Swiss-Prot record:
The gene is glyA. The modification N6-(pyridoxal phosphate)lysine is found at K230. This is Serine hydroxymethyltransferase. It is found in: Cytoplasm. CDD domains: SHMT. The lineage of its organism: Bacteria, Bacillati, Bacillota, Bacilli, Lactobacillales. Catalyzes the reversible interconversion of serine and glycine with tetrahydrofolate (THF) serving as the one-carbon carrier. This reaction serves as the major source of one-carbon groups required for the biosynthesis of purines, thymidylate, methionine, and other important biomolecules. Also exhibits THF-independent aldolase activity toward beta-hydroxyamino acids, producing glycine and aldehydes, via a retro-aldol mechanism. The record marks H229 as: Plays an important role in substrate specificity.
Length: 419
């Protein structure tokens, strides 16, 4: 007999209370962490189905277990929708995360110890792009490229010269904290000139790529990886795309059996839902609003000389602000804003002088507030509230004013109706 407790709240009150408290936090906080979003009820419902019961090692039509005819349907739906959404010939939807998608791509493309050119973490890259504390930096010989010191934007000529010098087997393009358009065609040209593979990690911009608001890397990269959350607004998970059949086979083998065992078919179902949502014209409207909101918010900081907007602006869903003109560090800013129910993260800026545990900057993204229905006016208001709080960080009465103004905004834009 199945052990079941219908009344979850009564059966496990301690856990229920923690979940409920998080629900309240999300409801009454302004979420500006660039890697976070608000998924649909359909995505949550798919992820909560009994598909979680099913083991399905292998791939559709080639499983190591029986009873997989319906999870094959689910996974094939996710695969075909991902291919349609991004214009790719092959898709792997089994990677549990973006980091595992990147690990699988590396396994398919290069060998341990090979030289890889990736974006330096302090310049806007990701841990999996060669950080020495990450598996990528421990397994491969990563060399970091940065941004131009004056413009704080990618300098493709400098990257080409660096590539000629280090002769990488692989070049990784993509970022976790870069606010400008990335020219994937130029990266392809650089890779071709030095005889390297090109891998693009589009985790942060996938929703913008899907809607044509950022140039797609799929036609230029040997392999494209992504998460399925962030701007794509799906469940937490990974995705790998390629147009090369030989690489597709290597990628599949790298994911299973190379890195993972059984796929999370309930999460794959949620991915399928989110891909369907992203194919809807309404998602393009959403993505356009994300870009508009981000630009509007960034402009408020650009017009205030107490702050410095990194690279002078933004073309996507994210931007960085140097805050040390008004408060000790990015960490201090993050902690202070937590107190007034505005959530964002400290972030290193290019050519950072403080430790990564303190930082000079903060990172701000608008994907989540846009999902709640907020627009340009609210984005500008939120930027002004951030400035008000940071400038008056030692004034408790003003901080209380900010907290109340935040509550007024969140009350106007409920997280979910009748959750």
């Amino acid at each position: 007999m199945i052990f079941d407790k219908d009344n979850f709240q009564e059966y496990d009150k301690e856990l229920w209370d923690a979940i409920h408290a998080e629900e309240e936090r999300q409801e009454h906080n302004i979420e500006l962490i660039a890697s976070e979003n608000v998924v649909s009820k359909a995505v949550m419902k798919a992820q909560g189905t009994l598909l979680t019961n099913k083991y399905a090692e292998g791939y559709p039509g080639k499983r190591y277990y029986g009873g997989t005819e319906w999870v094959d349907v689910v996974e094939n739906l996710a695969i075909e929708r991902a291919k349609t959404l991004f214009g790719a010939k092959f898709a792997n939807v089994q990677a549990h995360s973006g980091s595992q998608a990147n690990a699988a791509a590396y396994m398919a493309l290069i060998e341990s110890g090979d030289t890889v050119l990736g974006m330096d973490l302090a310049a806007g890259g990701h841990l999996t792009h060669g950080s020495p504390v990450n598996f990528s930096g421990k397994t491969y010989n990563f060399v970091g490229y940065s941004v131009d010191k004056e413009t704080e934007m990618l300098d493709y000529e400098a990257i080409l010269e660096q590539a000629k010098e280090v002769k990488p087997k692989l070049i990784v393009a993509g970022a976790s904290a870069y606010s400008r358009i990335i020219d994937f065609k130029k990266f392809r040209e650089i890779a071709d000139e030095v005889g390297a593979y090109l891998m693009v990690d589009m985790a942060h911009i996938a929703g913008l790529v899907a809607t044509g608001l950022h140039p797609s890397p799929v036609a230029y990269a040997d392999v494209t990886t992504s998460t399925t959350h962030k701007t794509l607004r799906g469940p937490r998970g990974g995705l790998i795309l390629t147009n090369d059949e030989g690489l597709a086979k290597k990628i599949n083998s790298a994911v299973f059996p190379g890195l993972q065992g059984g796929p999370l078919e309930h999460v794959i179902a949620a991915k399928a839902v989110s891909f369907k949502e992203a194919l809807d014209p309404a998602f393009t409207d959403y993505a356009k609003q994300v870009v508009a909101n981000t630009a509007a918010m960034a402009n408020v900081f650009a017009e205030d000389n107490r702050f410095r907007l990194i690279s002078g602006g933004t073309d996507n869903h994210v931007f960085l602000v140097e805050v040390t003109g008004v408060i000790e560090s990015g960490k201090a800013a993050q902690n202070l804003l937590d107190e007034v129910n505005i959530t964002l993260n400290k972030n290193s800026i290019p050519f950072e002088t403080l430790s990564p545990f303190k930082t000079s900057g903060i990172r701000i993204g608008c994907a989540a507030i846009t999902s709640r229905g907020m627009g340009v006016e609210e984005s500008q208001q939120i930027a002004q509230l951030i400035i008000k709080a940071l400038v008056n960080h030692d004034n408790s009465s003003i901080l209380e004013e900010v907290r109340q103004e935040v509550r007024t905004i969140t009350d106007r834009f409920p997280l979910y109706e009748n959750l």
